[in-house]
């Protein structure tokens, strides 16, 4: 009897996952995330140099980050532009150096282009959440400016904190020395989960439950790490793009990776936004099933079945939700 109950519970669990995946698929088709990802990839490439320039400018304003600029650049290139090659890094650093020597008007233009990227991300995620109420211009600009200024500082602070933790003497003990490589290897994954979690909870202009955002963040982080390794493997093992594009091969490489990255980000957002919709639908379906089962119970007891009208079902469901 216990085994039958366990099998039934497992079956219900898998059916629930299957129904959620079907609901997620309908949502993905409806929201056309491939088109949204293409738009965000284009805006990202347009604002890549301004974003890096603003980031490095913010970090250079704090003396504590001056000694780890190379470490921060390595972290960004390794995790966000995998297998793009040294050529891309040299060009980006050269562009950033040229941009930082510009006039006040030029620097202001860089900030505006960087804010355009943050605004595009904000609009795309709020469209996924079906948010009807828009932020005021003052609130939106304040949030964009906060992300632009505090984001680089948080990245730098997290790397400084990681370096400090790794240098602690507690890791020199024999019992913990084997844990250090594992901890270092898991750091990018932890950073990805934290970044996606913050993105899915802060950007939507409505309340997002922590567990829903955490689920979307974990899925997105896993896909992001797998995508990095898979894309790097493809670029190194199947370099057919070089035969086609020659010296310009780095351009499609960067664009394809940025596009795939945004597909992963939007997929995690869709999972986070779809969870409450699916749970509400399942809850309302259970309520309706229980209400419609009442006439059958009356008939089994010999009473004339009291058929509920659709208005009565709706009213009872509203009462149940209010309770």
From Swiss-Prot:
Subcellular location: Cell inner membrane
UniProt-listed NCBIfam families: PRK01637.1, yihY_not_rbn
Residues spanning the membrane: 4-24, 45-65, 102-122, 137-157, 182-202, 213-233, 247-267
Superkingdom in the source lineage: Bacteria
Record's keyword annotation contains Transmembrane: yes
Keywords noted in UniProt: Cell inner membrane, Cell membrane, Membrane, Transmembrane, Transmembrane helix
UniProt name for this protein: UPF0761 membrane protein Shew185_0314
Coiled-coil residues: none
Chief location category: membrane
InterPro entries in alphabetical order: UPF0761_bac (IPR023679), Virul_fac_BrkB (IPR017039)
Pfam family, one: Virul_fac_BrkB
Family of the protein in this entry: Belongs to the UPF0761 family.
GO CC terms, sorted: plasma membrane
Mode of membrane association: Multi-pass membrane protein
Source species: Shewanella baltica (strain OS185)
